[in-house]
Amino acid sequence: MKRAVVVFSGGQDSTTCLVQALQQYDEVHCVTFDYGQRHRAEIDVARELALKLGARAHKVLDVTLLNELAVSSLTRDSIPVPDYEPEADGIPNTFVPGRNILFLTLAAIYAYQVKAEAVITGVCETDFSGYPDCRDEFVKALNHAVSLGMAKDIRFETPLMWIDKAETWALADYYGKLDLVRNETLTCYNGIKGDGCGHCAACNLRSNGLHHYLADKPTVMAAMKQKTGLK
C-alpha cells in the first residue's frame, strides 16, 4: 500500500497537493501545525477540508514553541502584515524562520510512524514570496539529512516547485476541484477565507494567478501538463 503525509495548511497550495495525493496514493494522512499564527483560522479550514476530501487521518500538532522563538508578522499581532509591494527586496517580515525546517522534520517523523513513503509539501520556487525555505535546494538538503537521521528513505515531494500560481490553479482544475480551492481554502495572511483580504502578498499571488489562468485556460493547462508530466 502506498502511503503519503501531506503538510496541510488548508491554503490553495497544500489543498491542491492533497487533491493530487489522493489520486496517487492509497492512503493519505494530513498534518497541520498550530504555531500561534495570526491566520490560525486556517487550522479549522484544514480540518474541514481534510474530512471533506477524504484523508485517512488528520493530525494537528501544537508547535507554539515556534511562536516564542520566531519573530514575524505572522507570529506577532503587533507587527502589521505589509501590503503587497511588487518591487520589494529582501526577505519579507511574513517569513517565519525555521518554519519549514520544523514542519518537514515533524511530518517525516509522522510518516515514519504510519509507514508512509513520502512527505508532500506545497512549497514553490517559481513565484515564491522570497522565503529561503521554499527553495528546491533547501528541501533536497533537509530530505537528505532526515533520511540519514532516520535510516529510512522518506521522500520529500514538491509537486508545485516548478509551476507558477496560474498553473497551480490549472492543476486544481485538472482534478475537478477549482471551485473548491477557490472558495473553501484560506491562503490570506490576515486569515480571510476564499479571495482573502486582497492586499497581502499571498492574496496578490493567488489572485493574479487565478486571473491569468481564467484568461487563457488552454495555454496554461498545456504548460502545467508539460511541466508535471500529466496527460
From Swiss-Prot:
Question: What cofactor requirement does the entry state?
Answer: Zn(2+)
One Gene Ontology molecular-function label: ATP binding
Q: Which UniProt keywords apply?
A: ATP-binding, Ligase, Metal-binding, Nucleotide-binding, Queuosine biosynthesis, Zinc
Kindly list the cysteine pairs connected by disulfide bridges.
none
Judged by the first EC level, this protein's enzyme class is: ligase
Specify which residues bind Zn(2+) according to the UniProt entry for this protein.
188, 197, 200, 203
Q: In which pathway does it act?
A: Purine metabolism; 7-cyano-7-deazaguanine biosynthesis
Q: What EC number(s) is this enzyme filed under?
A: 6.3.4.20
- UniProt keyword annotation of Calcium present: no
UniProt-listed CDD domains: QueC-like
Cofactor binding: number and manner: Binds 1 zinc ion per subunit.
Q: Which residues are involved in binding ATP?
A: 8-18
Q: Which domain of life is it from?
A: Bacteria
Q: Which GO terms describe its biological process?
A: queuosine biosynthetic process
Which reaction is catalysed here?
7-carboxy-7-deazaguanine + NH4(+) + ATP = 7-cyano-7-deazaguanine + ADP + phosphate + H2O + H(+)
Instruction: Report the InterPro entries cross-referenced here.
Output: QueC (IPR018317), Rossmann-like_a/b/a_fold (IPR014729)
Q: Which family does it belong to?
A: Belongs to the QueC family.
Say what the protein does. Answer: Catalyzes the ATP-dependent conversion of 7-carboxy-7-deazaguanine (CDG) to 7-cyano-7-deazaguanine (preQ(0)).
Question: This protein is called what?
Answer: 7-cyano-7-deazaguanine synthase
According to its UniProt entry, this protein's organism is Escherichia fergusonii (strain ATCC 35469 / DSM 13698 / CCUG 18766 / IAM 14443 / JCM 21226 / LMG 7866 / NBRC 102419 / NCTC 12128 / CDC 0568-73)
Question: What is the primary gene name for this protein?
Answer: queC
